[in-house]
């Protein structure tokens, strides 16, 4: 594909852009996209849950290009929202626990994209990412989101379980990344 495709990206030519990065046929590998649990203060028992639009956009672009894609919305999957106390009793967790998320990861996952939006949650998300890599050592972990975009060198240094970071708007960067790895 043309290496300058991002500069030439025009919504009127979306199909031709996607066709340049189509998934291989009959490939059973999966791209899993995950929004992890949210962190709340110790005295908070719920927080409004928004839709994971970033992951939805990523998933939509990848699926349109033929990649098998699954989304785990650990913050918003449970209705009503589940809030539990952290194991160290210092904060609350809204959404699925680390263990519940690990159980939802498809064993055919080749790439796991994880949304790291808020720096204030990094202290809890980093050990979770390390748990993923321990259970699934062959999964390629890609971080995205505001936190990842702001301080990528720090994240890669502090969490070697993360293999790559995609900065900024990730829809087409993740598509090209996936194409090059598949």
Q: Whereabouts are the PLM-identified features?
A:
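Short catalytic helix/loop segments, enriched in acidic residues and glycine
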Residues: 48-63
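Short glycine-rich His-centered loop
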Residues: 30-49, 140
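A cross-taxon signal for low-complexity, glycine/charged-rich
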Residues: 1, 7-9, 25
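Glycine-rich beta-alpha loop elements in corrinoid/cobalamin-binding modules
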Residues: 61-182
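Residues that mark the start of a beta-strand
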Residues: 28-30, 68
């Amino acid at each position: 594909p043309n290496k300058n495709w991002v500069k030439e990206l025009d919504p009127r030519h979306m199909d031709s852009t996607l066709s340049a990065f189509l998934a291989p046929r009959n490939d059973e590998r999966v791209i899993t996209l995950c929004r992890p649990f949210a962190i709340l203060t110790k005295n908070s028992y719920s927080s409004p849950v928004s839709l994971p639009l970033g992951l939805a956009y990523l998933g939509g672009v990848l699926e349109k290009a033929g990649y098998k894609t699954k989304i785990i919305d650990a913050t918003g999957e449970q209705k009503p929202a589940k809030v539990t106390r952290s194991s160290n009793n210092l904060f609350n967790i809204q959404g699925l626990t680390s263990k519940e998320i690990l159980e939802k990861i498809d064993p055919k996952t080749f790439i796991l994209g994880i949304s790291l939006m808020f720096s204030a949650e990094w202290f809890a998300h980093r050990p979770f990412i390390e748990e993923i890599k321990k259970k699934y050592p062959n999964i390629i972990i890609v971080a995205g989101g505001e936190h990842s975009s702001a301080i990528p060198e720090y994240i890669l240094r502090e969490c070697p379980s993360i293999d790559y970071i995609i900065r900024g708007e990730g829809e087409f960067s993740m598509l090209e990344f996936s194409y090059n790895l598949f």
